[in-house]
Structure formats: structure tokens, C-alpha cells
From Swiss-Prot:
Record localization: Cytoplasm
UniProt subunit comment: Homooctamer; tetramer of dimers.
Any GO BP: pyridoxine biosynthetic process
Species whose genome carries this gene: Crocosphaera subtropica (strain ATCC 51142 / BH68) (Cyanothece sp. (strain ATCC 51142))
Protein name: Pyridoxine 5'-phosphate synthase
Gene3D superfamilies: Aldolase class I
Length: 240
């Protein structure tokens, strides 16, 4: 059954805009779980622009579903993950000047480094997912790292300027799923998904989890986190 991981980063973004203590992303995670979230996703960036180390430590103690820690493949972040032991880690690219993650990891271009990071984390019983574009070479390289999962970057699909291009990007995601599954990888997806565009991605064969944040937090500002999550679960089933 397809599951929903709710990314709570942008609750912390609102908090950090005023460098205050509210809203609390930990409280948001509790409400997201009450609304039906199957997991909580949080990205601890190197620049700490939203989530803070303390948030991640408290989430590790309070999340009742599973905690997916998004992070760069750096020594600092690997050490934090080995200490906190999230339920799994998603390795993502980072650039300090970006507004949000702009594309997938270049696994093929950093294969030995990423093999080492994946091995260290999975040897500590922390499954690893690699955030990548739906590209044949990147999917093949991901399998070579021995990571358990990939997360397909859905940004090109979500940002498509018209229906024809959107359908082409959806087909690329479908082919990516098929290739990954044939190589023994498990498949998640996320980035830019909304209540309006999520259903076709949710229907892709073999998809396990969608990680969705900004649109849910945006909706939660108006209707509350529990309802926003419930509505996304409906949208994923084509019932909204």
C-alpha cells in the first residue's frame, strides 16, 4: 500500500523567519501522524536554515511512525545520523544558494564516495534512500551502491508547463520505477507534489512512499495539519 511521508521542514521555516520557538515542527509531526501520516520526513541542512539539530533529536524520541532524515552525504551529517539513528536516511544534494533541492544526486559521478556512505549507514542498520532523477544511468549507479531505496525526483513532472510535457515526465518516472524494481531497489518519490498533481504519481506501479511537504504545510496554515494530511491521503487515492 502506498504510504505518505510528511515533510515538516517548512514549519521550521516559518519559525526561523523570526528566530523564535514557534511553530514547533515536533508538534506539527504529532498532528501529522494523527492526521494519518505514515512517516515524518525532516531535512537537516548544513546551513541549518530550517530544521535544527535539537528538532531532529526530539523527533527521534517522539515520532511513532518512522523518521526519514534527509541529509547531504557529508562527514558531519553521517556522524549525526549514526548518533541519532533515524529509521532511514535519504541522501540529497545541497547547494547553499538554492531555495529548495533543485535536482537529484549525481550517483554515477560520486560512486565510490556514496558507496562508502551507504555502507557506513546500512552497517549501522539505517537503510539508505538516494534522491535521484529518473535517469537510467543514475538508477543503475544507485543499485551499485547497495542502497535499499531510491527516491525519484518529481520536480520536472510537477513543474511541467503543459499537459504534454507533464505526461512525458510521468512516463519517465514510470520507466524509472520499472528499472529500479528490476534492479532490486525499492522506490519512493517526491518534490513539488501537490493535491492537484499527486494522483498520477501515486498510481505508478511499485511506488512505496511519497514524501510531500510544502503543499501540506501551506494547506495546514489554512485548515490545520490533521485535515491537511487527511486531504492529501484522499488526493493520493484520487478521492479529493
Amino acid at each position: 500500500m502506498l504510504t505518505l511521508g510528511v515533510n515538516i521542514d517548512h514549519v521550521a521555516t516559518i519559525r526561523q523567519a523570526r528566530r523564535t520557538v514557534e511553530p514547533d515542527p515536533v508538534a506539527a509531526a504529532v498532528l501529522a501522524e494523527l492526521g494519518g501520516a505514515n512517516g515524518i520526513t525532516a531535512h537537516l541542512r548544513e546551513d541549518r536554515r530550517h530544521m535544527q539539530d535539537r528538532d531532529i533529536r526530539i523527533l527521534r524520541e517522539t515520532v511513532r511512525t518512522h523518521l526519514n532524515l534527509e541529509m547531504a552525504a557529508t562527514e558531519e551529517m553521517v556522524a549525526i545520523a549514526l548518533d541519532i539513528k533515524p529509521d532511514y536516511v535519504t541522501l540529497v544534494p545541497e547547494k547553499r544558494e538554492e531555495v529548495t533541492t533543485e535536482g537529484g544526486l549525481d550517483i554515477a559521478g560520486s560512486l565510490e564516495k556514496l558507496k562508502n556512505v551507504v555502507d557506513r549507514l546500512q552497517s549501522a542498520n539505517i537503510p539508505v534512500s538516494l534522491f535521484i532523477d529518473a535517469d537510467e544511468a543514475q538508477i543503475k549507479a544507485s543499485a551499485e551502491t547497495q542502497a535499499k531505496f531510491i527516491e525519484l525526483h518529481t520536480g520536472k513532472y510537477a513543474d511541467a508547463p503543459n499537459a504534454e510535457i507533464r505526461q512525458k515526465e510521468l512516463e519517465s518516472l514510470k520507466l524509472g520505477c520499472e528499472q529500479a524494481l528490476s534492479l532490486g531497489l525499492r522506490v519512493n518519490a517526491g518534490h513539488g507534489l501537490t493535491y492537484i498533481n499527486v494522483y498520477p504519481v501515486a498510481c505508478l506501479p511499485g511506488m512505496e512512499e511519497l514524501n510531500i511537504g510544502h503543499t501540506i504545510v501551506s494547506r495546514a496554515v489554512l485548515v490545520g495539519m490533521e485535515r491537511a494530511v487527511r486531504e492529501m491521503k484522499l488526493a493520493m487515492r484520487g478521492e479529493l
